[in-house]
């Protein structure tokens, strides 16, 4: 039986506080110490500093997914499972995965969220380092909506955060 991987989450209070940069900095430290680290998917949102921090780390090619007349790039879950790194970086836990989901895929068909991909990686014995903002926590959706006037459409069940082996706050 495969030992379940560990999950570390960089948790921030808002977009742009440095979660992804903190995750990438940790990845460089681990990689420099000889650990098998792979960038599964990192969203740089056009930020040069974030993009530069990906340099020097192995990066899994993204999967191009046709959707509503366009193409989107997503984590290639099957390739990640096949590569089976010791540690994989998976940015933005709350992200909704775009595209078709079928029985031949490792990705659950019922509700394709990036956190589902993280669970598949953990179940395969791969350690995952990820990021999320606090407003994406499912139990806070009503509070966030009341304060901001905007309901979060992409949420992460509280259990996912409870399942994390380590949570690091970034503010």
Residue map of PLM features:
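Conserved P-loop
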Residues: 4-76, 82
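Conserved nucleotide-binding/hydrolysis micro-motifs of P-loop NTPases
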Residues: 29, 43-48, 94-95, 128, ...
């Amino acid at each position: 039986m495969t030992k379940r991987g560990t999950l570390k989450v960089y948790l921030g209070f808002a977009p742009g506080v440095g979660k992804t940069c903190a995750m990438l900095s940790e990845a460089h430290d681990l990689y420099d110490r000889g650990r098998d680290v792979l960038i599964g998917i990192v969203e740089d949102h056009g930020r040069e500093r974030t993009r530069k921090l990906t340099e020097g780390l192995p990066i899994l090619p993204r999967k191009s997914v046709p959707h509503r007349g366009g193409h989107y790039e997503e984590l290639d879950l099957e390739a990640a499972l096949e590569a089976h790194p010791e540690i994989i970086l998976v940015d933005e836990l709350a992200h909704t995965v775009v595209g078709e989901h079928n029985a031949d895929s490792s990705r659950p068909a019922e509700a394709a969220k990036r956190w589902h991909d993280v669970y598949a990686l953990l179940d395969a014995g791969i350690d995952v380092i990820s990021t999320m903002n606090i407003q994406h926590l499912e139990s806070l959706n009503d509070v966030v909506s009341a304060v901001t006037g905007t309901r979060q459409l992409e949420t992460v069940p509280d259990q996912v955060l409870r399942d994390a082996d380590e949570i690091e706050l970034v503010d």
